[in-house]
Amino acid sequence: MLEVVLQVLSISAITTTIALFFCGIPICMQIRRQGAVGDISGVPFLMGVLGGSFWLRYGLLKMDYVMIIVNVVGVACMAFYCVFFLIYSLPKKTFTCQLILVTSTIGGMVLWIALKPNLDYLGVICMTFNIMNFGAPLAGLGVVLKNREVSTLPLPMCVANFLVSSQWCLYGNLVSDIYIIIPNGIGMFLAIVQLALFVVLPIRENEKSPLEKLASWFTGRDSKVKDLERGDCIVSSPPSSPQKVPNETRSDVEDKFDKLMAETSSTIPSDSRRGSMGSPPSYKSRSSSDPDLSSIQSP
């Protein structure tokens, strides 16, 4: 039964680890769109080549075919990513020096194991490099904390690190290899720290982090803001107190009346004013042709 579990876990670890190696493809595509590496760090690729080469030599020395298959694919992928990163890096001097240093270290290790093979010494070195490899994405942690966003931290690689390290930690327990258990246990912890950054920090600037979005959803604050943007929520203003009309005195009313009469009299012609108001009305005497109204009696 244990052999079946080990075989299934070996296939699963090989599959997920190779999938981890392909997580560098989105990073390379982002570099190509930008035309330069920008703030993206090439340390994960360098550590992938370095750690993969040491683990490959460890697997060959131990004759562990699971580790041999995984690390052959891993070294090939990471070497391709390093060449791609070198093409787009400006200036190239820094990354070139780092690449030469990594290559020299691998060459020294191969020569040392060929002259004096020691599985324990090599296991300790592999364990150290593996821990550094899991923490390699933290090299860009300074940029993440400075910008307060995690766009430069590769999420697929962090997730894959967590899955792979947990499987290899279980694999190390089954094969009783302390050099596999310790680094992958630490790798699980580092992966959890990296994933926690994606929860507390936003992906891009001027955006909310997933934790803030969850808090807004629980409190309902986000829905209130959307209602205000749509104009659904109308805030009623308190009723305004009626304006008080100032009290007018009797003299003010008389002044307004005199002014109104003066304006009215100015619009009437002088002849009309004189005929209508100055002289009494004239009456015409009755002529003989006019009818005598006195003869008309009332009924």
Curated annotation (Swiss-Prot):
Residue spans of biased composition, Basic and acidic residues class: 247-261
Region (Disordered): 230-299
Domain spans labelled MtN3/slv: 7-91, 121-205
Compositional bias of kind Low complexity: 276-299
UniProt-listed Gene3D superfamilies: 1.20.1280.290
Topology of the protein relative to the lipid bilayer: Multi-pass membrane protein
Any one of the GO BP annotations: carbohydrate transport
GO molecular function, one term: sugar transmembrane transporter activity
This protein's record includes keyword Zinc-finger: no
Entry's localization field: Golgi apparatus membrane; Cell membrane
Keywords: Cell membrane, Golgi apparatus, Membrane, Repeat, Sugar transport, Transmembrane, Transmembrane helix, Transport
Disulphide bridges, residue numbers: none
Residue stretches spanning the membrane: 8-28, 36-56, 67-87, 95-115, 124-144, 155-175, 180-200
Role played: Mediates both low-affinity uptake and efflux of sugar across the membrane.
Protein name (record): Sugar transporter SWEET1
Origin species: Caenorhabditis elegans
Lineage of the species this protein comes from: Eukaryota, Metazoa, Ecdysozoa, Nematoda, Chromadorea
